[in-house]
């Protein structure tokens, strides 16, 4: 469970952040009660030029500067259309090239989600039934249908430059329809498995180096663990890697299992 104040306190984000932004992009103003009992109301304006932005200062402060008691948020019209399309790429690099081009072309997708080959094999195959090996990429657009169709047409052209298979709109829609299924049994991790999750954002020029640096470190130092990752939040200049290390069969002794888990984190 979560609350609006919780979203603000930890700078939360959602599935459609690529178009609609994170919580700090959605908030206009807030009321905050400070540790001294003072009440601060930030200005309900889109931008200002009168010193530091207190609204942004409180976003992500995780309760250290005060408790958010009220918030004024942006609202958006419900889109007339929302459409999805999916592609399979031979490897993550080809998919990343396509994803980066979707963003630098300023097409404004509402979502892009790229799964590396390992996570495609481990989760996408099981949830969506894709049999072929590769890196799975899905994107979507929403808004007025005529505009969405134009955006989709150009995005499909971009992906066809490096993809090995056009999975079509049905497989894209299937991802949207089942996007929360990944977090429920039997698809989510179960005992005795152990795993850790890392969120890292970088520019398009560096994000693949970050990915391979993490993956190779886990592979070389901890052969008993596997590394999977997907890229879930995209920006004009880069994207976020949602990476996981997984220990399918940790040591049966709890102290040894905890020690192994902590060593991976400390790497």
Question: What annotation goes with each model-predicted range?
Answer:
Residues 77, 88, 94-263:
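C-terminal substrate-recognition/cap domain of FAD-linked oxidoreductases
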Residues 266-267:
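Double-stranded beta-helix
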Residues 1-113:
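FAD-binding subdomain of flavoenzyme oxidoreductases
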């Amino acid at each position: 469970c979560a609350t609006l104040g919780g979203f603000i306190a930890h700078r939360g984000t959602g599935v459609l952040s690529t178009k609609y932004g994170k919580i700090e992009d959605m908030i206009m103003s807030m009321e905050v009660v400070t540790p001294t009992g003072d009440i601060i109301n930030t200005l309900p304006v889109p931008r200002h030029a009168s010193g530091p932005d207190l609204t942004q200062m409180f976003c992500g402060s995780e309760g250290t500067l005060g408790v958010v008691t009220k918030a004024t948020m942006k609202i958006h019209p419900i889109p007339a259309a929302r459409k999805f399309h999916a592609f399979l790429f031979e490897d993550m690099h080809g998919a990343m090239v396509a994803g980066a081009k979707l963003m630098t072309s300023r097409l404004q997708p509402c979502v892009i989600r790229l799964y590396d080959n390992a996570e495609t094999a481990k989760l996408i195959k099981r949830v969506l039934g894709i049999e072929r090996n590769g890196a799975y990429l899905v994107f979507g657009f929403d808004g007025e249908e005529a505009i969405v169709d134009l955006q989709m047409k150009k995005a499909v052209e971009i992906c066809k430059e490096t993809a090995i298979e056009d999975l079509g709109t049905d497989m894209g829609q299937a991802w949207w329809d089942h996007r929360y299924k990944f977090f429920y049994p039997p698809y989510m991790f179960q005992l005795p498995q152990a795993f850790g999750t890392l969120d890292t954002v970088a520019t398009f020029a560096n994000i693949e180096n970050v990915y391979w640096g993490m993956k190779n470190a886990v592979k070389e130092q901890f052969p008993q663990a596997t590394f999977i990752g997907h890229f879930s939040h995209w920006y004009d200049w880069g994207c976020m890697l949602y990476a996981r290390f997984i220990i399918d069969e940790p040591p049966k002794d709890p102290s040894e299992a905890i020690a192994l888990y902590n060593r991976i984190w400390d790497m």
